[in-house]
Amino acid sequence: MLKVGIITWHDHNNMGGALQAFALTSIVRRFTDSVQIIDYHDKAKVKVKLRIQFFLSKIGNIFNLNWKFRYPFLDFYHKYYKLTRQYDLKTIWDFDSSSIDLLICGSDQIWAPNKYSPVYFGEFYRGRKVSYAASIGLNYIPRHLIDSYKNALETFELVTVREEKAVELLRDKCGITAQCVLDPTLLLNVEDYKLIESPVSDIRSPFVFCYFLNEKNVYKQELEHYLSNCEFEIVGYSKKTDDSQWIRKLKNIGPKEFLWLVHNAALVITDSYHGSVFSLLYHKKAYIFRRFEEDDPINQNSRIEQLSSYGFIGKSQIKGLYETFIDCTVEEFEKELGILRARSLAYIEGIFKSC
């Protein structure tokens, strides 16, 4: 049986990061039962959260703690990830390469230049390497990193990335041939996600679900006209403190609750790539903000633009926003997604056929 390791951003307490790791693991399990996520944390101090989760589950009743909702991400990791031992920046270089037959790097923005780490290029591993939907995110690779990218990627058997912009950058700057594939969250059917949803109590239907990651932008101003006529309850997650004035912020929600909220919302408003992806999968109307200004040195809008290039989202009548199902019907979306999904899955299948 082929033994596979995955190196990705699996434990950043981020909805999209957790769900892309879940999705890629689920797809790989179609080809082998032996798949593990390498439990790497880039801080020298190893996190202990996963070590205490079993203990918390046992004492929860004693202290009247519902630890699954108090630690929703830990619950998700515990239930859906098979992890290796923990590694940090010092110990990852002692990784036993003989413990796996293949390393998959991806997905998510593990190759973002502003967060560059040789670990996410698999430089700790001596063996067969491929990438799946790894994202550079930015519109450039700094000159001082070009050789690092080139030298690392020349050791890969196959390089696939999430955005066409990354294909261009790797070709033009590094001389590396890469293929553009779907984010792994788009490879699973929506029914797969419905199976792991967890309901959120005390929400009146219909409701608007907001999911914002930008801490600076004041989105309410741009939605003023729509919100003034909205009688729905507005709930969600935002990193911006002031947003609590118009959004009822939900506490203790993790990936399973996030899926339920998207599924049951009358409308989704987001600046998140994966917020956009799951709105599409659940066939939801969504308003999508571009989180970054065009001149921002860490502009990551290429992710949203990739969805637009597929025809999945289009320019909204609300200035500056994208909107789902404005340039295509649900039926057209599913047809095009099916074509792109088959193409992306063929790359994964090809990896295992060559083993």
Residue ranges and their predicted role:
Residues 1-355:
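Active-site anion-handling motifs in enzyme catalytic cores
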